[in-house]
């Protein structure tokens, strides 16, 4: 894991605890994360993120909603250029091969009431 390899749960947990502390009783805590770009189904794009998402749900009591947040571009070339910049050349190649002007994207919204 490239982010907080040994103590990510303690660090993320501390951030979530602070979020809960500053949220009014009855308020909603919200975490927004990716569930995939350039894919036809929602899911964690890596094993470390799968572990993190499961931890949010099981250990921290968050409920997940999945929403489509596709990117829409005027041309295939614009789509390839922009997605290549943000997501790397592999996705840019897929965009060109599939002639996509609409890039599929899934976003997870985890929430929990305080």
Positions of PLM-derived features:
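A short SAM/SAH-binding and catalytic strip from SAM-dependent methyltransferases
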Residues: 1-11, 35
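Structural element of the ATP-grasp superfamily
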Residues: 19, 53-57, 112
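Conserved class I S-adenosyl-L-methionine
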Residues: 27-58
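Soluble or luminal CAZymes and related metallo-dependent hydrolases
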Residues: 11, 44-48, 104
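Short acidic/glycine-rich loop or secondary-structure boundary segments that cap or lie
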Residues: 3-5, 38-41, 73
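Conserved Class I S-adenosyl-L-methionine
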Residues: 58, 63-114
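A short glycine-rich, Lys/Arg-flanked "PGG" loop and its adjoining helix->strand segment in the class I
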Residues: 9-26
């Amino acid at each position: 894991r490239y982010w907080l390899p040994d103590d990510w749960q303690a660090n993320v947990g501390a951030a979530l605890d602070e979020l809960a502390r500053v949220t009014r009783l009855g308020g909603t805590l919200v975490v927004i994360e990716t569930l995939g770009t350039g894919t036809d189904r929602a899911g964690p794009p890596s094993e470390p993120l799968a572990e993190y998402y499961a931890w949010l749900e099981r250990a921290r009591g968050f409920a997940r909603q999945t929403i489509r947040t596709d990117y829409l571009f005027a041309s295939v070339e614009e789509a390839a250029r922009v997605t290549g910049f943000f997501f790397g050349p592999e996705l840019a190649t897929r965009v060109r091969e599939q002639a996509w002007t609409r890039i599929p994207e899934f976003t997870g919204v985890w929430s929990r009431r305080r």
